A protein has these predicted regions:
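C-terminal motif of bacterial Sec signal peptides marking the signal peptidase cleavage site
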Residues: 18-20
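Functional-site microenvironments in short loops/helix caps that host divalent-cation chemistry
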Residues: 25-40, 62-63, 69, 74, ...
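Short, P/G- and charge-enriched loop/turn segments at secondary-structure junctions
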Residues: 48-50, 80-83, 443, 473-478
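Short, surface-exposed beta-strand/loop micro-motifs that present aromatic residues
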Residues: 59, 84-86, 335-337, 477-478
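Catalytic loop of the DD-peptidase/beta-lactamase superfamily, centered on the K-T-G motif
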Residues: 472-475, 485, 491-492, 496
Length: 504
């Protein structure tokens, strides 16, 4: 055995020994880099969770991210070329298995009515879906307007008639309700006493003290919900609040980015050595929209319009069996276990729409629409803790600092694409350019796309087959709604996809 071989073996042996020591130190609750004990109430009181497993949020599926080709898979000659193919990487994340249902939204509006019905009815009204979206001049749809959202027969159908802004409000509400329930189940806080609201007529008190908000709980030292059976304590035995390091609270629910949504819809998996054998057209394999298997041969794999005047097939042999929307668990799920990623309803995504999105993008977690928010500090208390301003919904109020709104960063318009140097050598010239842009809505040359124009994807019950391809994209202003647009929530994954456990 020569000297080089001995040296290599010695190096490997030393590495294994050190790794073993580090592992043993960690297992024993001792820092491998300082030697100090973890979870020592008589020492530094540094708390560490050993062998921690992240829980999958309720109603969601853990999706392993990766590299894939985003963009058009088919061609519509008369359509705008706004989704050119390019390769990006998406981080692992969670997504709802089903579209948000009517029953889910009614749970939300019921909570709003229970909490704010007496003191702030306008907030309750703001959360209601727009039923008028069912009205069409040459169709009799009044029964849908009257019953679609409220009747129990439609409980399992997707919510429609909600704007992008309402969907974002729902995500924020869901974050707080899920985290509130997690703290209650862990015995950290008591369940809220909704019966006491009948005696409360002070709106500010309800928003500030009764409504649980995750950021308010973490940031506002004066906000202290009633203690539960098993509150957390510090080394001195004083009750303390839970923070993110305790592993009880979930991250924020939100709308999926366009890249996440498309990645989840195609559900492409490599079979061996990272090789993908099939470039899908739809969330299922093959280029056909009918089921090829003998058991359900010829049945449609999604809810869409088969042809002019044909929404569901002929009586006695109905195919997709849905004149309008269908139950959210209808049809076969894709390889990630997600239902209706094509058809049924289009779905809002987080992105601001730009037809040139493919020209300027990040190679990982591609997204346009960043607006960086800062909590609003109202004052400081007697010992210097920040006191944050609380908004009408009981949440920590936020603001956008100068230069923190980057929705139109390098978006291909005349200002950002052709006049970057003008801003450096002639700021006044750039200002004149902005001021002289066409803003007359009757002018055919006026831009119809703004920073409040959002992307929706997926195809719906009233769309032709072309729109079922997850790469297709359309847009609508964020304060508008339609009877064929719904949504589902997503959440960024904390930790590795291998460390996930289903929430019990």
């Amino acid at each position: 055995m020569n000297f080089k071989t001995i040296a290599k073996l010695a190096t490997i042996s030393l590495a294994i020994t050190l790794a073993g020591c580090a592992s043993k130190s960690s297992d024993k609750g001792v820092s491998s880099v300082t030697g100090w004990k973890y979870n020592d109430k008589e020492g530094t009181e540094f708390l560490v969770k050993n062998n921690f497993k992240t829980k999958v949020p309720p109603g969601m599926v853990a999706i392993e991210g990766g590299s894939f080709t985003v963009g058009e898979r088919g061609e519509f000659i008369t359509a705008t070329r706004d989704n050119t193919r390019r390769r990006i990487t998406v981080s692992s994340f969670y997504m709802d298995q089903y579209e948000i249902r009517n029953i889910d939204w009614r749970e939300y509006t019921n909570w709003m009515q229970r909490v704010f019905g007496k003191t702030a009815p306008k907030l309750v009204a703001k959360a209601q879906p727009n039923g008028k979206i069912w009205r069409e001049e040459l169709a009799y749809n009044e029964p849908y307007l009257e019953n679609y959202f409220t009747h129990p027969s439609f409980d399992q159908y997707p919510i429609v008639g909600v704007t992008w802004e309402q969907a974002m409000d729902y995500c924020a509400w869901r974050t707080d309700r899920v985290n509130e329930k997690a703290l209650i189940d862990a015995g950290i806080i008591e369940a809220p006493d909704f019966g006491s609201l009948a005696k409360k007529e002070d709106f500010d008190s309800i928003a500030t003290n009764f409504v649980f908000n995750t950021q308010k709980y973490l940031l506002q030292s004066s906000y202290k919900p009633a203690e539960g059976r098993r509150p957390k304590e510090d080394a001195s035995g004083q009750v303390r609040k839970v923070d993110m390091s305790d592993g009880i609270l979930f991250s924020d629910f939100r709308l999926p980015t366009e890249a996440e949504w498309e990645f989840a819809a195609y559900a492409t998996r490599s079979e061996k050595d990272g090789l993908v054998k099939e470039s899908k057209m739809y969330p299922w394999s093959g280029a056909q929209v009918r089921v090829p298997a003998k058991k359900a041969l010829g049945q449609m794999q999604a809810n869409f319009v088969r042809g002019r005047g044909d929404m569901m097939g002929t009586s006695g042999s109905l195919n997709d069996k849905a004149t309008i929307t269908a139950e959210v668990n209808k049809y076969t799920p894709n390889n990630f276990g997600l239902y209706n990623m094509a058809g049924n309803v289009n779905e809002w995504v987080l992105d601001v729409y730009r037809p040139t999105s493919f020209e300027e993008l990040s190679e990982y977690n591609s997204f346009r629409g960043n607006v960086y928010l800062t909590p609003v500090v109202e004052s400081t208390d007697e010992i210097g803790n920040k006191v944050y301003k609380i908004d009408s919904l009981g949440r920590v109020q936020t603001k956008v600092e100068k230069n923190d709104d980057v929705r139109n960063f390098k978006d291909g318009d005349a200002t950002s694409q052709y006049n970057f140097s003008l801003a450096l050598v002639d700021p006044k010239g750039l200002e004149n350019l902005k001021n002289n842009q066409k803003i007359d809505p009757t002018d055919v040359l006026c831009a119809k796309i703004t920073d409040k124009t959002r992307v929706y994807k997926g195809g719906s019950w009233k769309d032709r087959v072309y729109w079922l391809s997850p790469s297709t994209r359309r847009f609508l202003d964020q304060d508008k709604s339609a009877n064929d647009i719904g949504f589902r929530c997503a959440m960024s994954m904390i930790g590795s996809v291998d460390d996930q456990t289903t929430k019990k």
